[in-house]
């Protein structure tokens, strides 16, 4: 089975927030997945939609796959490098703020007949 992949690296959204969105489209057909992402009011939705469109374009251009038969076969989010920042607090102290990043990997493949 031929599959096409797209990866977005170091996206400035925390992985646990992106996972909420990618869990909605796992196993869905591409058209349905795009519709779900368009109607999901989360900051990660447009980013995941862009990765999905990239994977579909890769499938069409690199592997000559039929875009109507594609499904989101695999999608996962890994943690990227963390940006460490400090927030001033009372009494001259400072608290660490971790600004987390994500690596989003999305794989589309042709749906099996039957």
From Swiss-Prot:
GO molecular function, one term: rRNA binding
Coiled-coil residue spans: none
UniProt GO BP: translation
Alphabetized Gene3D superfamilies for the sequence: Ribosomal protein L22/L17
Record bears the keyword Cell cycle: no
UniProt KW keywords: Ribonucleoprotein, Ribosomal protein, RNA-binding, rRNA-binding
Domain of life (superkingdom): Bacteria
GO annotation, cellular component aspect: cytosolic large ribosomal subunit
Family stated for the protein in its record: Belongs to the universal ribosomal protein uL22 family.
HAMAP family from the UniProt entry: Ribosomal_uL22_B (MF_01331_B)
Subunit structure: Part of the 50S ribosomal subunit.
Role noted for this protein: This protein binds specifically to 23S rRNA; its binding is stimulated by other ribosomal proteins, e.g. L4, L17, and L20. It is important during the early stages of 50S assembly. It makes multiple contacts with different domains of the 23S rRNA in the assembled 50S subunit and ribosome. The globular domain of the protein is located near the polypeptide exit tunnel on the outside of the subunit, while an extended beta-hairpin is found that lines the wall of the exit tunnel in the center of the 70S ribosome.
UniProt name for this protein: Large ribosomal subunit protein uL22
Native organism: Lysinibacillus sphaericus (strain C3-41)
């Amino acid at each position: 089975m031929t599959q096409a992949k797209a990866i977005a690296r170091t996206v400035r959204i925390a992985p646990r927030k992106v996972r909420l969105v990618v869990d909605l489209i796992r196993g869905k057909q591409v058209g349905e997945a795009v519709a779900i992402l368009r109607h999901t009011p989360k900051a990660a939705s447009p980013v995941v939609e862009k990765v999905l469109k990239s994977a579909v374009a890769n499938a069409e251009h690199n592997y000559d796959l039929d875009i109507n038969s594609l499904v989101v076969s695999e999608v996962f989010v890994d943690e990227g490098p963390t940006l460490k920042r400090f927030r001033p607090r009372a009494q001259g102290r400072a608290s660490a703020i971790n600004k987390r990043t994500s690596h989003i990997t999305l794989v589309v493949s042709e749906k099996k007949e039957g």
